[in-house]
Each structure stands twice: as structure tokens, then as C-alpha cells.
Regions:
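Transition-metal
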Residues: 1-71, 75-78, 135
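Short beta-strand segments
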Residues: 52, 84, 131
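Short amphipathic beta-strand/extended segments with alternating polar/hydrophobic composition
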Residues: 62-64, 99-103, 142-144
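Short, conserved beta-strand element in jelly-roll/cupin
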Residues: 74-90
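Short hydrophobic/aromatic-rich beta-strand segments that constitute the beta-sheet cores
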Residues: 91-93, 117
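Short acidic-glycine-tyrosine-enriched beta hairpin
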Residues: 93-110
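Surface-exposed beta-loop interaction hotspot
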Residues: 117-151
Length: 151
């Protein structure tokens, strides 16, 4: 399984004032994140932030590193937040499995070697919205369930 990614670059404020709708969409809209059985990422040159989606339907999806990171593992120097916006799913981090229901999230600390996304039901796949940023310290993984949310 390959992780698909594109790169985005910073835009000078004087430049984007001249953009038409098509150019604004091309430079700022992030679409196509939730394609069945794919991990799709957008790596931005703005603080090296990554936004993405993982939609495991028929097969588990491993979060492999991408060339832009120049790292052996995706989370060697990064942390990850994954929010499930689809059907029930699971995320396995270095052998520990977390059940992640709709609207629940998992924080994965820097240094994790293997992250795998799965769906409970292929007919109603999990859709994990991903955010990743550089990290200079590793914190423990933490599931944030609906009961943990401030209401």
C-alpha cells in the first residue's frame, strides 16, 4: 500500500489577492481525502503541517512515511491526531489497538513506528481525518471518546 500525497507551498499575500476562484481553489482547497482503501495526504510547506484522510474499507491501511519527511517512519519526528468522521473503526499503534467510534479521536505521540487504520464494517467504512505536525517531544497516545468531550 502506498500513501498518496501532494505538496503545497506558501503563497505571498500580494499574490493571492490577484487569484481568481479557480486559482484559490487550486491553492487552498483540500479535497479527495476519503477514497476507499487509500491514505491521502497534503504536505504543506507552511510549518510542515500535514492534513489527510484514511478510509480503510476492504483492507487495513498502514501509515507509511513519505519522501518529503526524510524519515524511516512517518512519526519519527511528528505527532498525529486522527478523528473518525465515518463508521466504526480501529487504529493500531505499535501493536496496541484503539476502538474509535464516530466523532472519537486518537492522539499518537512522536516516535510511533507503525500506525494501521481499519474499519469494523467495510460497507460503512471508518473515515479518519488526519492532522500531523512536527514534534520535539513524545507524549503518550491518548484516545478521546465522546464521554471525554466537553458538553
Amino acid at each position: 500500500m502506498t500513501v498518496n500525497y501532494t505538496e503545497r507551498y506558501a503563497v505571498h499575500p500580494d499574490d493571492y489577492e490577484m487569484y481568481n476562484s479557480a486559482m484559490l481553489r487550486e491553492n487552498f482547497h483540500v479535497g479527495g481525502l476519503f477514497v476507499a482503501d487509500e491514505v491521502n495526504l497534503v504536505y504543506t510547506q507552511i510549518d510542515r503541517f500535514i492534513v489527510g484522510g484514511a478510509c480503510p474499507a476492504d483492507t487495513p491501511l498502514k501509515l507509511d512515511t513519505i519522501d518529503a519527511l526524510k524519515a524511516v517512519h512517518f512519526l519519527d519526528r511528528r505527532e498525529l491526531g486522527a478523528v473518525n468522521v465515518g463508521g466504526a473503526g480501529r487504529i493500531t499503534v505499535d501493536g496496541e489497538t484503539y476502538d474509535i467510534a464516530y466523532k472519537e479521536a486518537l492522539y499518537v505521540g512522536a516516535g510511533a513506528k507503525e500506525v494501521v487504520f481499519e474499519s469494523v464494517d467495510a460497507a460503512n467504512p471508518a473515515k479518519f481525518y488526519l492532522n500531523s505536525a512536527t514534534a520535539h517531544h513524545s507524549y503518550p497516545n491518548k484516545k478521546v471518546g465522546l464521554d471525554d468531550a466537553i458538553k
